[in-house]
Each structure stands twice: as structure tokens, then as C-alpha cells.
């Protein structure tokens, strides 16, 4: 994809899973890639593999260091680091706060650091790894579902606010992806996500198709579009069907 050749790219949460697949694909397309992960060893391993630059640490705090590593300019920022927090309304406030911080506020902080320069030069690309849970909700995972809705809303807001000023925004909303996060989703993940789970590389493929077509919403599982339309057309019917899944999950527990 010509749009990313020689671009300076940052991918957070890129020590494995979707992030590593994105980093590999950007590097294969000729981009210069900063690989970020909280796990410094994993970040360095992926960076070494793809000829990138490892900048480990909290995704919220590395924009300046990543920009310096790329020679002063970030062209593409992939806000990919995420927290798959399960639980109900009774989850401890710390769980809710951590999910909000990683899944939403890290995106806000990155945008705050990057957008002034992007607007000044009239170009920039912000990629948000959201989730189908940001469109549809996920059983057994209130903090995750709520904060992924927030991540989607922020990406949407960025796009509708700045698209006429050269900012490209992409929101990736996959269902199940074969990563550690799917394993951590436990029985709810096995019921809802595992049957149609795709490889992380399929998510990267979907993003690059979306970049080529200049599309905001990236759906590695195309059927999610129909689910989203069904939810909008008849919310009560949609939630009744989701509640049937909830009851099946409870019965199987």
C-alpha cells in the first residue's frame, strides 16, 4: 500500500497477537516501525524480527520517545494495546479504572500528543484497535464492552471532526482473534468468539484493505456489519437474542 511506504509507524501492544501482526505487515509494506509493549523482551523480539525499533513501556507515555526514534515524525499511530477486562457491574472499581485507562484514555492521550502536528501538515493516520464488543457488547465482560464502546466513539469523533483536515482514522472491530486475550476470555469466549476466530494476520489484512479503500470501519468478520444493522433496526430483539446466549453461558458454567 503506497500510503505507508517509508511511513513512520507506531504500534502499541505489539509484543504479540494483533499488534505483532500489524507491526509485521507495516514493516513488510516498507514502513519504519516502532514496536511498543509493556513487556520489553517481547517488544525487542518483534522489533528485531522486522527490523524495527523497540520502545517498551506504558503505551500512554511513549509518544515522544517513539517520535524521536522515528526522526521526529509519526505518520501512523496504531492504538492497539488493550485490556480484556471481564466481570459485571460488581467488578472492583480498580478493574473499571484500568480498563478505562488502557482502552480509552491511552487513545485520547496519544491523539492529544499527535494531532497538532498532523493538522499543521495536513496528514496523519490514527488506527484504533477496538473490538466487535465496541459495536455489539460481549457477555460476561461489562468493563471491556463499555470501554470498547468508548474507544469506538472516540475514533468516530476523531474522524468526523478532522477528516476534512487530512486526518485518516480507522476503527478495527474484530470478533474472536486467536490471541492470548481470547484464551483469557474463558468460557464466554469459547461460546461466542472461538467458533469464528481468525488469525491475527487476517486482522492486518483487513486493515490494509481498509487503508487502500480509505474506509473508517474495519471488519475482519464481515458478518458484524449485519449484526450491527440488526441491533440498530430492532434493539429489543437483538438484546433478547443476546440474553439467550447469556442464559446458555450460565447453564454451561
What are these regions (language model features)?
Residues 8, 15-16:
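Conserved glycine-rich cofactor-binding loop
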Residues 47, 51-72:
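Conserved amphipathic alpha-helix within the SDR
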Residues 111, 147:
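Active-site helix of classical SDR
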Residues 131:
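Residue(s) in the substrate-gating loop at a strand-loop-helix junction
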